[in-house]
Regions:
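N-terminal low-complexity, intrinsically disordered segments
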Residues: 1-104, 276
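Aromatic/basic-lined ligand-recognition segments
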Residues: 10, 82-101, 105, 144-224
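A generic structural motif
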Residues: 29, 113-122, 156, 227-230
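Extended intrinsically disordered, low-complexity coil regions enriched in Ser, Thr, Gly, Ala
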Residues: 33-55, 120-144, 231-251
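Short glycine-rich, low-complexity/disordered patches
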Residues: 51-79, 138-156, 179-182, 254-276
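Hydrophobic alpha-helical segments and helix pairs
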Residues: 91-137
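Long, compositionally biased interface segments
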Residues: 216-276
Length: 276
């Protein structure tokens, strides 16, 4: 049902569905990563955000991933190449979440947030990663931003299919659990990739519903919004404020509009009541 949902905003609504957020900025290769990390570690704001630091060897992250996070609680990695990741953890940003990490490599920085019930806002995390990129512009004025992205994964388990559609819009996915004959649904998923010409942002939108044991249902909504070099926006992004504006006002606001389009008005009403 197409209903007006404009009254629901990020300021008056709180979602209980949000499980994980990834904020990521890709850039041209840093010449001396270790020296840049020392610069970051010397700042006051990083010590206000994170308590601990370590290096790890891992495969580079790939943002084009299948939505399995709700079950595994982690983002799976696609193999590209082995890289050193400088990881800041034990996040001190209030309210403290169950697991938040800041990763920096020679080609990207990302913040991964595993959200708990006390999660309130993405803004302090956007501010943190914008500080990183702002320091990078100062450290190396020749740095070129190649991609800016936010990915949000919402999901919940339900007792039955009717309960699913009290939260998620039914017309956003197939309606029947019966395929044909005696065949019954195990899992269905839909992924759309498109360019939103109004916001000038690329979107990967995945919706999946899986039948679990005892005929319970798991629904996952996975929204990835990003801006890359093909959109001719990043060339003018040369400071912290530019990064912050793209993440907060262009990308995150648009992801919230997509989220609203995929959940019911009844659920949005309950979110306002809970928030108040």
């Amino acid at each position: 049902m197409n209903m007006d949902k404009s009254k629901y905003t990020r300021n008056n609504f709180h979602s209980s569905l949000l499980k994980q957020i990834i904020i990521r900025v890709d850039f041209s290769n840093i010449t001396d990563l270790n020296k840049f990390i020392l610069t970051i570690k010397s700042t006051d704001w990083i010590r206000e955000c994170f308590q601990s630091y370590r290096t790890i060897q891992a495969n580079n992250f790939n943002m084009n991933l299948s939505p399995k996070v709700f079950e595994d609680k982690v983002i799976p990695l696609s193999v590209i190449e082995t890289a050193t990741i400088h990881r800041f953890y034990e996040c001190k940003i209030e309210p403290v979440q169950s697991d938040v990490t800041l990763d920096i490599t020679d080609t990207f920085t990302s913040i991964t947030i595993h959200c708990n019930d006390t999660y309130k806002s993405i803004n302090p995390y956007i501010d943190c990663i914008s500080n990183i990129v702002g320091e990078l512009f100062t450290y190396d004025p020749f740095t070129q931003i190649q991609r800016i992205a936010i990915r949000k994964i919402d999901g919940q388990d339900f007792e039955n299919e009717d309960a699913v559609y009290e939260v998620f819009e039914k017309d956003k996915s197939a309606n029947s659990t019966l395929i044909e004959g005696h065949a019954r649904l195990i899992k269905k998923s839909y992924t759309d990739a498109y360019l939103d010409t109004y916001a000038n942002i690329k979107i990967n939108l995945s919706r999946s519903m899986e039948v679990l044991l005892e005929n319970k249902y798991r629904y996952v909504l996975d929204i990835d919004g990003y801006i890359d070099t093909s959109l001719n926006i990043l060339n003018n992004c040369r400071d912290k404020q530019g990064i912050q504006d793209i993440l907060q006002f262009r990308t995150n606001e648009h992801l919230f509009c997509i989220f609203k389009d995929n959940v019911t008005k009844g659920y949005l009403d309950s979110g306002i009541k809970d928030h108040e």
